[in-house]
Amino acid sequence: MEAAVGVPDGGDQGGAGPREDATPMDAYLRKLGLYRKLVAKDGSCLFRAVAEQVLHSQSRHVEVRMACIHYLRENREKFEAFIEGSFEEYLKRLENPQEWVGQVEISALSLMYRKDFIIYREPNVSPSQVTENNFPEKVLLCFSNGNHYDIVYPIKYKESSAMCQSLLYELLYEKVFKTDVSKIVMELDTLEVADEDNSEISDSEDDSCKSKTAAAAADVNGFKPLSGNEQLKNNGNSTSLPLSRKVLKSLNPAVYRNVEYEIWLKSKQAQQKRDYSIAAGLQYEVGDKCQVRLDHNGKFLNADVQGIHSENGPVLVEELGKKHTSKNLKAPPPESWNTVSGKKMKKPSTSGQNFHSDVDYRGPKNPSKPIKAPSALPPRLQHPSGVRQHAFSSHSSGSQSQKFSSEHKNLSRTPSQIIRKPDRERVEDFDHTSRESNYFGLSPEERREKQAIEESRLLYEIQNRDEQAFPALSSSSVNQSASQSSNPCVQRKSSHVGDRKGSRRRMDTEERKDKDSIHGHSQLDKRPEPSTLENITDDKYATVSSPSKSKKLECPSPAEQKPAEHVSLSNPAPLLVSPEVHLTPAVPSLPATVPAWPSEPTTFGPTGVPAPIPVLSVTQTLTTGPDSAVSQAHLTPSPVPVSIQAVNQPLMPLPQTLSLYQDPLYPGFPCNEKGDRAIVPPYSLCQTGEDLPKDKNILRFFFNLGVKAYSCPMWAPHSYLYPLHQAYLAACRMYPKVPVPVYPHNPWFQEAPAAQNESDCTCTDAHFPMQTEASVNGQMPQPEIGPPTFSSPLVIPPSQVSESHGQLSYQADLESETPGQLLHADYEESLSGKNMFPQPSFGPNPFLGPVPIAPPFFPHVWYGYPFQGFIENPVMRQNIVLPSDEKGELDLSLENLDLSKDCGSVSTVDEFPEARGEHVHSLPEASVSSKPDEGRTEQSSQTRKADTALASIPPVAEGKAHPPTQILNRERETVPVELEPKRTIQSLKEKTEKVKDPKTAADVVSPGANSVDSRVQRPKEESSEDENEVSNILRSGRSKQFYNQTYGSRKYKSDWGYSGRGGYQHVRSEESWKGQPSRSRDEGYQYHRNVRGRPFRGDRRRSGMGDGHRGQHT
């Protein structure tokens, strides 16, 4: 009957007895007169339960599942709203028999079979009627473990089912198998069978029966357990029962067998045994070595597997010389593989551990002989000589083992001594063996891929290690770690070396000599390429490795090293690494493996550990070029600038990579596959992405740029692109034979609309004027029409138009002029032989607009790139409007060019005396100086006075507020030639002083010679003052901006008497010390005096543009 029915050992959930109420849910249901029938715990438990209650057979659960899927597809409008994602994909997943289902399927089954579902969820809690369709018939289920459904029947169902089951089995055996079962049933004790059955299959909430789990644990080796008859015979209950125990249960009218659940439980146990055998490595093959124990409490003996059968297999016991079919097998320990029978061998202990004899500790006779160690690899993967290892003589194996163990004892006793050559060989052999064991079971492709990943990780850790996290190791600690690492190789030595004595030893000697020569030539900066690892074979001596490689080389090194630097610890000699050594790459180049760029804004330190981001203190650049020696970095989470006295520390928090050449955005502009500069691609307007660039390098650059810009919204893109571009130019200059490329266009804003239709920038549209781009030869480039999206980056609100006192109308008049004569021919002299790389434009432009954004502080040291002010920064004024006549000049080489010294060489008051009484003022022009502080001084003062001048213009004089550009160019030609290289002009502050008082204006106007003298002398004096201020600021350790942060409470002198023209309005209630707000500009108080008695000409607190003008010079 066992073969016919196919029912394995198991039990029931029925019968009388206290064991079946072991779970609270069963006890609760029994009180209600209900019985829970267990269902197979897989993805089809719901369909199994419905199939039995509706179709009276669990075997039809697949049919119920497919019918449910069909019903869901036919009534898609009813259920699609409750499905996340694609409805068709959901139905496709439901076709998998292991896919779990839920409320949607229950609702569909209720409508399909016209039955309401009642589910018991928790003990002592009323059931839930999940479907309320008012069907007369009900389906009772028990929900447990969050995803499993069992069947709930009235308790009478179990009693009647047990009686029917016994009658069915009795008819089957008597009529079909011709077996008289009446006498057999009478001989059995019904209650005993019932109790045993209940104890075997008493299911709990967490898993199946406990006794079955225990039986499976005892049967994990794949041996067949005793049958029911044998168990009964051993217990003495019966001596001649021809039927199995489960058949006897089926014949018992008081016991109900849950046949479906027993079949699933048996298959589950078989699968668990297979999984356990695979996981534990207990799948033996013919020829494998193992250990057997013939008796229950006997010793484990070494054996070889001679044959594999379905469950049990014969093994050859070496120590007994006989074949046995054993049930208790285990894998041999590593130290027992070189143990063979001999007269001097000490017998192993009962625990299976082998001990060395007394001879093992006497020391080796010849320590220079090569040592062949046993293998840690599985038996079938090692060299064929490992199978014949037991054929060695006892003297040979014993001498080898004692040499090996004694040498390792000597190593542990003297850890500070230099390790001898044989020991070093064993260290490398062990490293090779451990590496091979890590790749066990992988294909060659997977092995190479894993090795490449490990090499990349090790290289990244060597380059970016942290001195403080891993301090430098002393010589004794290095040697001690090396000796400790070499100890385990006593047990896990590779057996790839053959066992032949004569020829093998000669070959080992030659290999050792070759290896010693290799180690003699190995240097600190040698690094094996990833391709080298692919060529590593069984030759253990071809790999330069480290004893502590498994710990990822924790020896420290400087933060900036050569990209190809690699620390070789093949010879564990004393290794001292100074934490103060700073290596600078002679030729900047990308490392062999560039570490992955983490997602912003996480900042990674040298060891790859994410560090907290300082609030408003993250800077995206580290050095201005490859010539800077950068030491170990320290993150400063405080937004207040710290002291810069420490020369060996970077002034800013570290970016994601320690070098500009490792930045994903390097070199700051897109390059094609050939490495040439690529043209900025057009915008992608297709949703499918068909118009995206085909070049992956261009796509990668703009993707990284977009991620960076999105992750750092308070940083203008050129703030981190400019240092990369400068680093690229510095790298190009390091090669004198390579011509430095000249890019006439702006490095980043190439596609900006250079000169659009004048109607786009007039005052009617309230648009700020666009900037044009100037080439290096002084000629204007052809205007390029950009996308209409960026034609108006910022619109001035109407409130600002009324407050600007004719500023926009004056701007419109300036825009109507022809910009073709902006640049004079004299510019060619200043540009020749100097920096041919135009710096990024700053100010109102199509991408950034007139309101720049950046954190409201300035770094300790200015790196030369434009640093913009924040909109809420009190030192930031965003109301400077540049006319279209001068907008092309800002893109010239700002490092060597002073535009204001040409564009404003002669003031409008000197040129047009007749307009002096009409309060004609010249528009302030953005000034750029060859010195950073001088440029800031002139620009700040010019901006402040420009606000004063514009505020005092009467509306009637708006139409006469500018001279023609041709006249300006003609006046420039009157400047003496000897002053051309100097290019210093009269400060705009002095121009404004002349205009301030109309009564004394005639006295202020001086001849051309005096004007030239003042132009030559005055900027030099201001420059000397600024140099002293900068030196004092640097010695104090704080930037000037730090002392000027008022956070929106101060009002500027340029704003006295009228409201601001942009941004946020400042509070004037706290500024009573400044005097009456209605004080006239002509009543004096032109400058406040500083502590030295000099006016605040160079003080950035008076600046109208704040930090913005710092971007005009390098």
UniProtKB/Swiss-Prot annotation:
Name under which the protein is recorded: OTU domain-containing protein 4
Pfam family for this entry, one: OTU
EC class name: hydrolase
Changes after translation: Phosphorylated on Ser-202 and Ser-204 likely by CSNK2A1-CSNK2A2 serine/threonine-protein kinase complex. Activates 'Lys-63'-specific deubiquitinase activity.
Residue span of region Variable-loop: 94-104
GO molecular function: cysteine-type deubiquitinase activity; K63-linked deubiquitinase activity; molecular adaptor activity; RNA binding
Region of interest called Disordered, as start-end residue ranges on this chain: 1-22, 323-449, 472-567, 911-1114
Chain intervals for the UniProt region annotation (Cys-loop): 39-45
InterPro entries: OTU_dom, Papain-like_cys_pep_sf, Peptidase_C85-like
Disulphide-bridged cysteine pairs: none
Domain OTU: 34-155
Biased segments, Basic and acidic residues type: 420-435, 496-529, 913-922, 969-1000, 1067-1086, 1096-1114
Naturally occurring in which organism (per UniProt): Homo sapiens
Keyword Repeat: no
E.C. number: 3.4.19.12
Catalytic activity: Thiol-dependent hydrolysis of ester, thioester, amide, peptide and isopeptide bonds formed by the C-terminal Gly of ubiquitin (a 76-residue protein attached to proteins as an intracellular targeting signal)
Region (His-loop): 143-148
Assigned GO CC terms: cytoplasm; cytosol; nucleus
Induction: By HIV-1 insertion.
Localization per record: Cytoplasm; Nucleus
Protein purpose: Deubiquitinase which hydrolyzes the isopeptide bond between the ubiquitin C-terminus and the lysine epsilon-amino group of the target protein. May negatively regulate inflammatory and pathogen recognition signaling in innate immune response. Upon phosphorylation at Ser-202 and Ser-204 residues, via IL-1 receptor and Toll-like receptor signaling pathway, specifically deubiquitinates 'Lys-63'-polyubiquitinated MYD88 adapter protein triggering down-regulation of NF-kappa-B-dependent transcription of inflammatory mediators.
Entry's Gene Ontology BP terms: antiviral innate immune response; DNA alkylation repair; negative regulation of interleukin-1-mediated signaling pathway; negative regulation of toll-like receptor signaling pathway; protein K11-linked deubiquitination; protein K48-linked deubiquitination; protein K63-linked deubiquitination; proteolysis
Designated gene of the protein: OTUD4
